[in-house]
């Protein structure tokens, strides 16, 4: 009889189900693992044999063949130890292991070690196989217990896993764990946020227009570029935006944790949306991601999914990187294709850029002379193509900073966050599945209702500035967010006027 327990391996960022099969034949004693198993799985033979013998199990004097199916799929990870050990320990018992999954690296004493790399696999299994029963390390219970629709049995030792399989009446652990974060409830769904502001907008002096643009961008996930002289507060404003972004659903928190684990970062839960800030010298693969068949890694763009991607000194990024941004900015996905592999990442993020007006930075200064020649200014401006700029919703030229300026509007991060929460509620009450800045054409028609005055103003702007269809949709979406910040059901003339004022006209 061939017994089977299921496990999984990560392939191109997705969990692929693996059937772990075992047969025992009368022949010279041997222990063979087949099915494109890498060295970490091959080394399981020593760990499993020692763990069984140290727990009073007689290792069978037979030829043991472990097959990992499908055989053409490369597999890796020490978490295959547990299913292999269970199949060997239960060789003489006829048990039905249908829909049973087991994950865990064994110590030589049989204890199951923590392994946060299992998390992305469990997350995918919960979605694709809602009836699956999973045995996982007790040490990772705090991390795994939040995954919805997952029947999980947490064990500390190999013997506990064995007992669970031999006693099917044992119930899965009930997960009552809740995240210790602030919440709001909308449409019977909880959203999590933080009311701790490590950086506060009240510290920003002057720059009322830029602060308002930051508020609108945060509330609707609208792409933003701030342009101004060095030291005027561009980065200061953008670094504070991360603390006023909209709250997250549980699924978004889980997805962000999955991405961090895949990129070999920490596995903690956070009530803040991800904030990625790559340096201008970063390589193309580090920003776009790797599509290597063996170890694909998400890049900065993928890690910013559902969060914020900040490019400081925007024109100094490589031209091919800036042009590669056009697809994820427009379609909210990034496809990386190679000869032997292809991987797709979700990329619904808020893009924010900061730039000087010229190479020396003094073009907009009222006190310093610009040292650039006209040709240099033109070359600098041309680093950002028109198709790229057309994907930017909000463009602000900031005034030169003045030490004597008082904090503008007396806006604090807490106040701005409350307005963002108000706009977020308006969007969710309309049953929107996406932020205003990410609405498609059909959703724009449905949710972006203009009154007569706003419609007339938009038509005049289209005729005067020759706006593209993309630009028109961008203006409508920004106006929708401005209306939400004012708790207005329809887009009015004042909202449209403000949205047009933030549009970069060629």
Regions found by a protein language model. Give the residues of each.
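Residues immediately C-terminal
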Residues: 108, 309, 316-317
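Peripheral, non-AAA+ core regions of ATP-driven protein-machinery
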Residues: 1-225, 232, 236, 270, ...
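Walker B catalytic acidic pair
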Residues: 228, 306, 312-314, 324
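Basic, amphipathic alpha-helical bundle interface domains used for macromolecular binding and assembly
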Residues: 34-45, 60, 67-77, 293-296, ...
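Walker A/P-loop
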Residues: 224-265, 331
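Conserved alpha-helical scaffold flanking the Walker A/P-loop in AAA+ ATPase domains
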Residues: 215, 269, 274, 282-309
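Short loop/turn elements that form and flank the Walker-type P-loop nucleotide-binding site
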Residues: 59-62, 96-97, 129-130, 219-221, ...
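Active-site phosphate-binding and catalytic loops of NTP-dependent enzymes
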Residues: 53-62, 92-100, 226, 249, ...
